[in-house]
Amino acid sequence: MASHAVWRPLAGAAASSARLAASKSTPTPAIAHFARSRAGVQAWETAAVTRRLCSAGAGQARTAVAGGSFAGSRVFAALQQPRTTSFAASPLAALRQNVARSARALTTAAIDSTSSGSSSSTFPDPPEVPLTSPLVSRYLFVIGGLVFAIVVVGGMTRLTESGLSITEWNVIKGVKLPMSQAEWEEEFEKYKLTPEWKINNQHITLQDFKTIYMWEWSHRILGRIIGVAFLAPIPYFVYARKLGRGALFALFGIASLIGAQGAMGWYMVKSGLDEQSVQDLGGVPRVSQYRLAAHLGLAFLVYSACVRFGIGAARDWKLAKKMQGLGGWKTVEETIRGLEGKVAGRTRVLVTALTALVFTTALSGAFVAGLDAGLIYNEWPFMGGKLHPPSYELNKDFYCRKADKSDRWRNLFENPTTVQFDHRMLAYTTFFSVVSLFLYARRPHIRSQLPPLTYRLIKGSLHMSVLQLTLGITTLLYLVPTHLAATHQAGSLVLLSLVLAAGASLRRPSKVAREALRIAQLRQKAAQIKV
C-alpha cells in the first residue's frame, strides 16, 4: 500500500509534466482562433516567449515546463536535489529511486520532443491590423488636384461673370453641350429671361453668350467628374480591403461634403436668377456673398480633407509597414519620440491655429469677391489717405434691417468698405503669424526637435505668404484684372496646402498604425529568435 501511495503521485506528476510539455508544441484550433483576434496579441507574445525558451536548450525548456505545473515543479525539485540517500537503505527507498529515475526519463523525453519540434511547430500568427493602402492616398491626392482645378475654374467663372449663364440644374441633361445653332439659340433665350441680361448684358451677342456659357458648363462638368471619380473606386477599395479602420467613414464624410458642395453651388446660382433676391442685394444681378463664401468654403474643406487624410494614411503605412522614419527622421523610434515631445506638440498647436487663420482669410476673400469690394479703395497701404477708412464708412446704418439698429454686425459681411478692411487686416495677421512661426521654428533648440520636413514646409509657407500678399496688393492696385485675381485665389489654396502639410508632418501616428507597428516589431523579433 505504501509503494502504491508513493508511485501514483509521482507517476501522475511525471505524466502531467509530459502532457504539458507536449501541449506547447501545437496549439488547438480554439487557441489559434483566439490569437487571430485583437485580444490574441498577448497570447501570441506568450507563445513567442515559449518558443524562445524552448529553442534556447533543453535545460531552459525544462525550467519553463516545470514552472507551468505545480506537480511538475515537485518532480524537478526532486530531480535537482543531490543524491545523498543510499540505494541499499531500504526496499522503500529503492522503490522511490526507481520511480524518480523513471519520472526523470519520461520528462526529459517530453522536453526533448518539445525542443526539437519548436522550430517546426506552428504557432498562432499575430492578428493582421488593416491599414489604409498607399493606393488610397494617391487616389485622394488626385481628387485633391481636381478640387484645386475646380476652384481655379470657379474663380475664372466668377471673374468673367459667367456663373448665371446656365439657368437650369439638370444633373443628367446638363452634361450635354449645345451643338446645333437651334440649341444655342434656345439656351440664349432662356438667359434673356434672367435679371443679369435685363440689367447688365442686353448688349451681348450669341457668340459672347457662348463664351460665358462654356466657363459655367466647364465648371459644372468638372464638378460631376469629381463626384464620379471619388465614388467609383470606393467599392473596389472595400472589396480588396484597401481601407483601414475608420477610413470608410472618413470617405463617406468627404463624399457628403462633395454632395453638399454641388447643392450649395446651385443654391448660390439661384440667388442671382431670382428677381426678388436681386432686389434684396441692392438691385445688382449677382449671387449672394453668403452663399458664395459657403460654396468656396466647402470646396476648401473637401480639398483639406483629401490632403490631410491622404498624407496621414501614407505616413501610417510608411511607419507601420515599412518601419521607416517620417519627416526626415531615420528611425521609427526617433520619429515616435520626437512627435511625442513637447516641442512638437507646441508647434502642432501653432500650425493648427495658423491653418484656421489661413482658412478664415480665404473666406473673407470670398466676401470681397461677392461684393466687388476690390473695386474700391484701390490704393495701398492706405485707405483714403489713412491706414483705415473713416469710422462712419465702416459702420453704416444703411445695412441694418432692424428698426433699433441692433444688427450692425451686417456691416462685417455686407458693407464693401468694411469687408475689404477686414480682409486686409486678416491678411496682415496671417502674414505676420507665418513670419512669427518661422522665427520660432528656426531657433536651434526648437529646430533640432522638429522633423526636418516640418521646418522646410514652414519656410515654404513664409515664401508663399510673401507672394500671396504681393498678389493681393497688385490685384487691388490694378482694379482686379481677371488672371491676376484668379492667381491670387489659387495662391490662397497653395498657402493652405503648405500649412496643411506642415501640420500633417507633426501628426502623431494613429492608434491603428501604432497597433500595426507593434505587431510588425513582434514578428521581427520572432523571426530573429527563430533564426
Question: Residue spans of the language-model regions?
Answer:
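N-terminal alpha-helical interaction modules that lie
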Residues: 11-19
